[in-house]
Amino acid sequence: RRPIGLKGENVHYIHKPEQIPALLTEIGLPLPRKLAIEWDASHGDFTRLSAVFPDAEITNGSAVMRKVRSVKTDYELGLLHESAVKHAEVYHRIESVYHNGMTDIELQIEIERLLRLHGNLGLFRINGQSMEIFMGNVICGDNADTPTPYDFAMGGAGLSCSIPVGCNGSLIRPGMTVMIDMCGNFTGYMTDMTRVYSV
């Protein structure tokens, strides 16, 4: 998302937005008359950018940014493919870390360990206010019916009411189905894979 070491005519590095006006002046560009900001940006970011460009008209740039992000370069597609291949390799090993008597959290920890050992970066970004999850979600039994207040396809009560999603310490019993929805981030581009296993 923020690569370093890029070179090119229009590549300039800054440490904070307040440096942008001086940079634009230095390279001979005018300050913007209109500034598009994503509407789900924090109030602090909105206020800060507005102060950097006090004469600019602020407009909603959410739709434009979503459209820009939806189109991937060949380089980005390559990174997504690389991440997906590694993600799939880990999923082929999930059965090897399961043993009788495990809880959902114990299985999730083993899957997280596999992911990290295979190069998963361990950091995931979720779009949306106050939505958090660690590396994914493993749910089984009655917990699979528990709704979450988050805008996720899967629910689960979670281990704490402060993060109400995911595994809750349920014992995985014979005859149960286990839904595994773990994130892959091996290249800076996220993949998501969901599988259902029968015990």
Q: What is each of the regions a protein language model found here?
A:
Residues 2, 59-62, 69, 73, ...:
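Short, acidic (Asp/Glu-rich) active-site segment that either coordinates a divalent metal cofactor
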Residues 44, 133, 186-188:
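Flexible loop/turn segments at secondary-structure boundaries
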